């Protein structure tokens, strides 16, 4: 099976049930019983802890439910207005190179943002995608402010990927204040709407679909 099956889930998907369904799909892909898949969805407000999460980075543990995700990375927030893309691809077929896979995810996000004339950038030592904010006050050292617009955290099981990425369309950015996102204190978070772009979830989904084959060819 080579065609990637796309699903756009309506409403807010409960985290635990979605994680269980994702694990079942990964097992089916590994067994050759199901096609690779990408699920586009939103979660209710919650925090997830990756395998590198530090307790001190959970600033407000009572604010929202906290889930141990099992993916790489640290703490992140999911909630309404944020598009989560769960990416279940067979790297045994596509190439057993985890770093290349994460780079391809970043490139996919960067290409998607470019569809809206947003320049997303990667930073050494900071997984995810960032935007420079010349409209905001510079840092204490005079460097321009940079805000995170997309987070990436993945896990592999027998070379099938799961978890994936999240892109901020129009979430409540104050909800990120309950954590230190991805363990990075010196930078903020932003969204497409925060950047002044009236982008809808449907607009973003269409851009994700258009740009995907450039970075993950069959």
Curated annotation (Swiss-Prot):
EC number: 2.3.1.181
Major localization listed first in the record, in broad terms: cytoplasm
Ligand binding (substrate): 71-78, 151-153, 164-166
Active site: 182
Subcellular location as annotated: Cytoplasm
Pfam families listed in its UniProt record: LplA-B_cat
Positions of the BPL/LPL catalytic domain: 32-218
Gene3D superfamilies: Bira Bifunctional Protein, Domain 2
InterPro entries membership: aa-tRNA-synth_II/BPL/LPL (IPR045864), BPL_LPL_catalytic (IPR004143), Octanoyltransferase (IPR000544), Octanoyltransferase_CS (IPR020605)
Reactions it catalyzes: octanoyl-[ACP] + L-lysyl-[protein] = N(6)-octanoyl-L-lysyl-[protein] + holo-[ACP] + H(+)
Domain of life from the UniProt record: Bacteria
Signal peptide: none
Entry's Gene Ontology BP terms: protein modification process
Cytoplasm found in the keyword field: yes
Alphabetical UniProt keywords: Acyltransferase, Cytoplasm, Transferase
GO cellular component terms given for this protein: cytoplasm
Pathway assigned in UniProt: Protein modification; protein lipoylation via endogenous pathway; protein N(6)-(lipoyl)lysine from octanoyl-[acyl-carrier-protein]: step 1/2
An example Gene Ontology molecular-function term: lipoyl(octanoyl) transferase activity
Site location (Lowers pKa of active site Cys): 148
Note: In the reaction, the free carboxyl group of octanoic acid is attached via an amide linkage to the epsilon-amino group of a specific lysine residue of lipoyl domains of lipoate-dependent enzymes.
Purpose: Catalyzes the transfer of endogenously produced octanoic acid from octanoyl-acyl-carrier-protein onto the lipoyl domains of lipoate-dependent enzymes. Lipoyl-ACP can also act as a substrate although octanoyl-ACP is likely to be the physiological substrate.
Family: Belongs to the LipB family.
Protein's recorded name: Octanoyltransferase
Taxonomic source organism: Cereibacter sphaeroides (strain ATCC 17023 / DSM 158 / JCM 6121 / CCUG 31486 / LMG 2827 / NBRC 12203 / NCIMB 8253 / ATH 2.4.1.) (Rhodobacter sphaeroides)
Lineage: Bacteria, Pseudomonadati, Pseudomonadota, Alphaproteobacteria, Rhodobacterales
Gene: lipB
